[in-house]
Regions:
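Insoluble glucan recognition modules
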Residues: 1-285
């Protein structure tokens, strides 16, 4: 028996997993303590229930992934195998950078700041920065030199362009987003949200962080695993909060980007989470 799916990868080396349910686990009791593993990944190149992600291919683009099942006793790998075939290579840029006085400086590559790939949205990148109104910035497809820099695409909102540089109207924390596929660049008020038990629920768009100068802060409502994400103006992000998820590890902000679930970060009720995106740091106290 063959099962096929088409996957549009954002970047070269993107990965996926196989699920037989709407999750890689099925809860077997009310409390969710006992679970059955029903997903498939790779262990030493072979299919297994507890394996890692399946790398689609070395190039970004459309892939046809075929999962083949044949009844066989023994290990999972004796019953399941897969193939990944590139059917259309992507022509979209695989990266986006910010450069300029409003970001860090005008010198490549040291002053260029990499934007984050949005999960499951090919060609979309995002970043949060505190930007001062009188300091200009630009976008770039590369971080090595000038020549691929730009101030916008087809549709541009939330900023002005003067002397071939971008400017915001006032000092503040901004969400910068680029969609190469649809030719869109937006700059909007940055919004950070908590998600899950640590913030009292799983409702998207609730549990907003507070802006404190050039930082975000929030207080956890209960014990649980810390999960956070950035709000987006892009339609594909609606209902997909995890497309722009991140967390704090050893004092640094680390982004999910195109990867799987990040490692759990346990917190207790009443802890203060502080995020400094310009510095790339965070604290949980």
């Amino acid at each position: 028996i063959d099962f096929t799916a088409t996957v549009d990868t954002t970047q070269s080396g993107d990965s996926t997993k196989v699920e037989f349910n709407d999750d890689i686990n099925i809860n077997l009791d009310v409390d969710g303590v006992v679970k059955a593993e029903v997903g498939l990944g790779l262990t030493d190149g072979k299919m297994s229930h507890t394996g890692g992600n399946i790398i689609a291919g070395e190039k970004a683009g459309l892939y046809t992934i075929t999962l083949t099942y044949k009844k066989s006793a023994g290990a999972i790998a004796d019953s399941f195998s897969y193939t990944c075939t590139l059917t259309k290579e992507s022509t979209l840029p695989e990266a986006c950078y910010l450069i300029g006085e409003g970001i860090k400086g005008w010198t490549f590559p040291g002053d260029a700041v990499a934007m984050i790939p949005a999960h499951s949205e090919p060609g979309c990148f995002w970043a949060i920065r505190y930007i001062e109104a009188e300091k200009g910035f630009k976008f770039s497809e590369i971080n090595t030199d000038w020549g691929k820099d730009f101030t916008g695409r087809t549709t541009n909102t939330g900023y002005t362009v003067k002397d071939n540089n971008c400017y915001v109207a006032e000092n503040g924390l901004y969400m910068l987003e680029v969609d190469y596929k649809n030719g869109v660049v937006t700059v909007s008020k940055a919004m950070i949200y908590g998600m899950g038990d640590a913030f009292g629920g799983w409702n998207e768009g609730a549990n907003a962080f507070t802006v404190s100068g050039d930082k975000f802060t929030a207080t956890t409502a209960a014990a649980g695993n810390l999960r956070m994400y950035a709000g987006s103006t892009f339609a594909a992000a609606t209902g997909n909060w995890w497309h722009r998820e991140f967390n704090v590890f050893d004092g640094k902000i680390e982004y999910r980007a195109g990867g799987g679930d990040q490692a759990a970060v346990a917190v207790t009720a009443g802890q203060t989470v502080t995020l400094d995106f310009n510095a790339g740091t965070g604290s949980i106290q």
